[in-house]
């Protein structure tokens, strides 16, 4: 009983921490395939109007991302934040080297301020680890375009046996001491980064499975298993779309949910979401703000960012509006959740499925009866044909006694007349 209480209390608040940062997991069999992938996605952003620098992180196992968030807000689970920001070697090394030094060094801050060509600029790092490959990409970019403008450095582990380290440098004309400092530091630390990637992969795989086994409450497992970035094709969704903002409702594990997505370059840093629900009160209709049950940001390797928020539809037949806001420009986009009754649609779908099943069974029975009838008719016709073939010679061949044939043959040899044919009984009667 006490064990259940000890587990349930931290899970409800999303603070299921291990007592220590996970060390090398040697007693756990990692049955990883080529498709298994660990993704660390860390970025630094700074608005030109202030001196505050924010850094964020994404930690994902293959396509099941269990943490989206930044250092200031609790997104998804504190457990994921704890692992991402404190325990993993590659993340901690690059995070400390880039972000912590930026906060402390005035010279680097001045250099970084020169990047502020627009409202906000970024330094973006992507770390991909797997048992068979490692991939680290470092990019500096600004809001004026999706493609990197100043620096793009890529490290790729080409051959695991001899640890061939392939580097792609694209400085685009920038002669920056800090750029070369990053390059030389990561180059000298290539073996450490390779080993750290493999170690981090094993650790994350182990602790993710262990955490899922401990998180017994419904909402905890729901958050861990849900990823709106990967939409199942066989899942029926009812949505309203905008160029940048969309609002959809569907069922997830038997629960009615709605997800609002804000799509665009950099929205994970400067975007915000808000969902309002129309309620009736004694003074008329009012709009009430609805808190998200789960939120997050997604930064793909290529393409636009996605900021999403999920709510449970406890009161379905009401009006929900999602507002996607660009905090830099103040631009807002509002979309309304489709007015669709999922229960009614499910009942109609069930009844239609029953009708389709009955129709299928009826057609199958008709086809089976037709097949049996055709086989019977074919068998009867075959038997009738065989009978006719067997009786045909008996109907057309005349039967003569052997003695008469011999006498007639003898008479013909000696020039005598053959015996007269016997008249039939009918002719004799006439």
Curated annotation (Swiss-Prot):
Keywords: Glycoprotein, Host endoplasmic reticulum, Host membrane, Host-virus interaction, Membrane, Transmembrane, Transmembrane helix, Viral immunoevasion. N-glycosylated. Residues 384-430 are cytoplasmic. It is found in: Host endoplasmic reticulum membrane. One of its GO terms (cellular component) is membrane. Signal peptide: none annotated. Glycans are attached at residues 31, 142, 162, 293. It comes from the Viruses. Residues 1-362 are lumenal. Its main location: host cell. The chain crosses the membrane at residues 363-383. It is a single-pass type I membrane protein. The ER-lumenal domain associates with class I MHC molecules and is responsible for lysosomal sorting. Belongs to the herpesviridae U21 family. Binds to MHC class I molecules in the endoplasmic reticulum and targets them from the Golgi directly to the lysosomes. Once in the lysosomes both proteins are degraded. In consequence, surface class I molecules are down-regulated and infected cells are masked for immune recognition by cytotoxic T lymphocytes. This is U21 glycoprotein.
């Amino acid at each position: 009983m006490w064990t259940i209480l000890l587990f349930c209390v931290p899970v409800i608040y999303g603070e299921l921490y291990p007592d220590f940062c996970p060390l090398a997991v040697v007693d756990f069999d990692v049955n990883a395939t080529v498709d298994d992938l660990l993704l660390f996605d860390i970025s630094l952003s700074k608005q030109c109007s202030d001196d505050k620098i924010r850094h964020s992180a994404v930690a994902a196992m293959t396509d099941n991302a269990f943490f989206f968030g930044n250092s200031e807000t609790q997104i998804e689970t504190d457990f994921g934040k704890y692992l991402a920001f404190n325990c993993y070697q590659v993340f901690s090394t690059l995070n400390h080297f880039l972000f912590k030094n930026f906060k402390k060094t005035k010279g680097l801050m001045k250099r970084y301020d020169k990047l502020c060509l627009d409202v906000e600029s970024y330094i973006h790092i992507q770390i991909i680890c797997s048992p068979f490959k490692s991939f680290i990409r470092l990019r500096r970019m600004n809001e004026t375009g999706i493609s990197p403008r100043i620096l793009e450095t890529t490290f790729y582990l080409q051959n695991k046996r001899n640890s061939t380290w392939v580097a792609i440098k694209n400085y685009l004309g920038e002669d920056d001491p800090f750029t070369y400092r990053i390059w030389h530091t990561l180059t000298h630390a290539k073996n450490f980064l390779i080993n750290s990637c493999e170690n981090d992969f094993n650790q994350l795989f182990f602790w993710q499975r262990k955490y899922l086994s401990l998180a017994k409450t419904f909402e905890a497992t729901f958050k861990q298993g849900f990823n709106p970035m990967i939409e199942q094709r066989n899942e029926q969704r009812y949505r309203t779309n905008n160029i940048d903002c969309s609002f959809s409702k569907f069922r997830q594990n038997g629960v009615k949910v709605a997800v609002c997505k804000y799509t665009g370059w950099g929205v994970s840093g400067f975007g915000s979401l808000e969902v309002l629900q129309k309620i009736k009160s004694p003074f008329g209709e009012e709009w009430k703000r609805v808190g998200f049950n789960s939120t997050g940001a997604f930064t793909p390797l290529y393409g636009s960012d996605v900021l999403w928020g999920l709510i449970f539809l406890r009161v379905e037949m009401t009006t929900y509006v999602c507002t996607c806001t660009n905090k830099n420009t103040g631009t807002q986009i509002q979309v309304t959740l489709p007015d669709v009754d999922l229960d009614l649609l499910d009942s109609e779908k069930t009844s239609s499925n029953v009708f389709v099943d009955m129709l299928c069974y009826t057609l199958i029975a008709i086809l089976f009866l037709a097949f049996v009838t055709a086989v019977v008719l074919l068998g009867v016709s075959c038997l009738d044909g065989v009978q006719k073939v067997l009786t045909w010679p008996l109907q057309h061949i005349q039967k003569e006694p052997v003695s008469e044939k011999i006498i007639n043959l003898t008479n013909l040899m000696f020039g005598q007349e053959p015996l007269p044919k016997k008249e039939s009984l009918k002719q004799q009667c006439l």
